[in-house]
Structure formats: C-alpha cells, structure tokens
A protein has these predicted regions:
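C-terminal segment of classical bacterial N-terminal signal peptides
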Residues: 16-24
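N-terminal secretory signal peptides that target proteins for export/translocation
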Residues: 1-2
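A composition-driven surface/loop motif
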Residues: 5-11, 24-173
Length: 173
C-alpha cells in the first residue's frame, strides 16, 4: 500500500513539474534612468543592459511593467540625447499601466536598431509609447516596434524627423 501511495505522490509531482507556468514581468517602482549614468549596468532578469560609452540600451527578453499608480507623469525608461536602443529577440515587452507614464523618453536624438521586436503598451491617453524631446527618432535594420498606446505612438516635441532606412516597420494595433 505504501509503495502505491509513494508512486502516486511522485507521479503527481512529476506531472505538476511538467505543467506550463506563467512568467511575470518585473514591476518598476522607479524608472530606469540612464541620462547621467557613466558606468555600464545590466539586469539580466529584467532583460536589459546599458553601455555607457556608446549610450546604447540593449534589450533581450525585456519584461517590464509599471503598475497602476506608480511613475505617474513620468516614464519607464529615460535616455540621454543620441541614445540607441538595440533590440534583440522577439520577446521584449514594456507595459505602463499608470497615468501619463511614457514608455521610453529620450532627451534628443533616438535610434532603434537590431533585428528584434519590442512591444510597448501604454494605458493612458496622455502617454506616449516613445517620447523624444528633440528628435529625430530613427529606425535601422529590421527592428520592429509594436506599439499599443492609448495615447501617442511616437511624440516628438520639436520634430525634425527622418527615416533613412526602408527596412523599418512600425506596427500599430
């Protein structure tokens, strides 16, 4: 009897271990602010790495969420002028569920590059998926930005836009 019971418990444990589980995004209580960062930094669990010398934010398996009531009238990610966001892989997401919380804010020129996909979701009519103070916002390679905003997809305060590559794709949902 005890052997049957033990076999049943072990079988149940093995089956439960084989079940798919949900992976939850890291909640942002404070913004990722790279504007005055002079040292390299990374959070592999959240899926980002900052190269200070080239002002490049690399995202690979990025999974960040700003919960409701946090970072209101701010942004999830702040970048300095002449920054680059290098997108790797197709499993990158940035969600802002807070009032007027932009996804990515840049002080000036912002470049997206890489062969990956980044999904940015904002949950406020007064928020932008991408907000550039000076612009331009440039897309290289075959980077794909899938934006699902309640507000703006891209907002450039002092627009000087250019699109030098025909290999970009902006998908609106």
């Amino acid at each position: 009897m005890t052997k049957k019971y033990l076999c049943g418990v072990v079988s149940a444990a093995v089956l439960m271990g084989a079940c798919p589980t949900a992976v939850f995004a890291a909640d942002l209580e404070n913004p990722l602010d790279f504007r005055s960062m002079t040292e390299d930094a990374a959070d592999t669990d959240a899926g980002w790495a900052w190269d200070a010398s080239s002002q490049t934010l690399t995202v690979e398996n990025l999974s960040l969420t700003v919960p409701q009531g946090k970072l209101e009238e701010r942004a999830a990610i702040y970048l300095p002028d002449e920054s680059t966001v290098r997108v790797k892989g197709s499993n990158n997401s940035l969600n802002t569920l807070s009032y007027h919380c932009n996804g990515i804010y840049c002080e000036g020129e912002l470049t997206f590059e890489g062969k990956g996909k980044l999904k940015i979701v904002t949950d406020s009519y007064s928020a932008s998926a991408i907000y550039a103070k000076q612009g331009p916002v440039t897309f290289y390679d075959s980077v794909e930005i899938a934006a699902d905003p309640d507000g703006h997809v891209i907002y450039i305060e002092k627009a000087k836009g250019k699109t030098p590559s025909s290999a970009y794709r902006m998908m609106l949902k």
